[in-house]
């Protein structure tokens, strides 16, 4: 009987040992890194690639605006056949060409070009903002998978420990040292552990699906990640940095400039326009056996002076001024959002760091408490329920540490993102960076051509 009781106690200690390690010794041999995931997201993320296409679309608006500076040339050809009572059937053909060149349009084209160019700069900043958000989402997706895999592993260890508790409780019952209540309590805790493990595995699958969506590939084995470096020293320093470099703020400032140019362009519609027109044509006539032809050419300058347009021009000017006012307000809106994001990220980072320290101390205390409860249980001073509760306390604090370490990394990158310093270049990612100015230079002064710069 003593041997059987001793064996049951050994099994109880073994269950505690299963929980004594903090997290996953096998993590040392993992292959995928956070930097590698960021590189993949930079290259593969579909919404980010869509934003890049949006910049290229905006580039073409500059070429469209500049087209008003250039001549508009049209050709024409007409043929007709008719007869009058006094003549035979007559076939007439006319071929002609006409050129229209704007000489002055109240500075509308100049301001439209300036607005289009400024909108290109705004779109580039929006792209940089999307790039930052994508990389931050990749960090969050990476850390979510890593955290939830750790939690699932802890749940597996906890289930193994509960299995040991059930076996130990049954062994004590067999030798008369325990009760059926002890066995029932152990089995109930094991059932709870099974449910928690299943939920943890489901969470892992969900996180892996999000990782696939953001990064563009399924997560392999992941290595631990550290917090972002070169963080600001205070919230005020972070906000000062954001005012100078956050792409969201810069984009709204460019939008204000573009709206200002748009107001000037609309006001230009009140001014006279001057245009040059040149044309040439050839007329060929066939009537029976007779043939005739004639050539004409003309050139002229015309002036159009707007007098009244039914209120349309005035309404467009007022509308553009309201759009300018809205754009100025949007600057304040984005600045407030950035300030809030910095404050939130800073608070979360501080709380997570404090939580890491507290939970590390908590693990040591919970492990000591579990060891003590097991020893006291051996001499009858504690019940099986006390042991189960102590084990659950240890698992809870281990999971809390995993979550706190996850939060430190994510909050540090959230702070970096909020300050506007989370681009591929600033993170030092070894990847061929997308350069929007290359497409812009290729199309901004293009006079003709249907193919895009990449050959489509």
From Swiss-Prot:
Q: What is its main location?
A: membrane
UniProt keyword annotations, A-Z:
Antibiotic resistance, Cell outer membrane, Coiled coil, Membrane, Signal, Transmembrane, Transmembrane beta strand, Transport
Q: Name one GO biological process term.
A: response to antibiotic
Q: State whether keyword Amino-acid biosynthesis applies.
A: no
Q: Does the keyword Ribonucleoprotein apply?
A: no
**What's an example of a GO molecular-function annotation for this chain?**
porin activity
The knockout outcome noted for this protein's gene is: Mutation strongly affects resistance to bile salts and toxic chemicals, and significantly decreases the resistance to antibiotics such as erythromycin, ampicillin, tetracycline, and norfloxacin. The mutant also has attenuated effects in the mouse model of infection.
By its UniProt entry, which Pfam families does this protein fall under? OEP
List the residue ranges forming a coiled coil, or say none. Answer: 312-341
Q: Name one GO cellular component term.
A: cell outer membrane
* Compartment(s) of residence: Cell outer membrane
InterPro entries registered for this protein in UniProt? Bacterial_OMF (IPR051906), OMP_efflux (IPR003423), T1SS_OMP_TolC (IPR010130)
Q: How does it assemble?
A: Probably part of a tripartite efflux pump, which is composed of an outer membrane efflux protein, an inner membrane protein and a protein that expands the periplasmic space. Could form a tripartite pump with BepD and BepE or with BepF and BepG.
The cross-references to NCBIfam families, in alphabetical order and at most eight, read: type_I_sec_TolC
Q: What does this protein do?
A: Involved in the efflux of toxic and relatively hydrophobic compounds. Influences survival inside the host.
What protein does this entry describe? Answer: Outer membrane efflux protein BepC
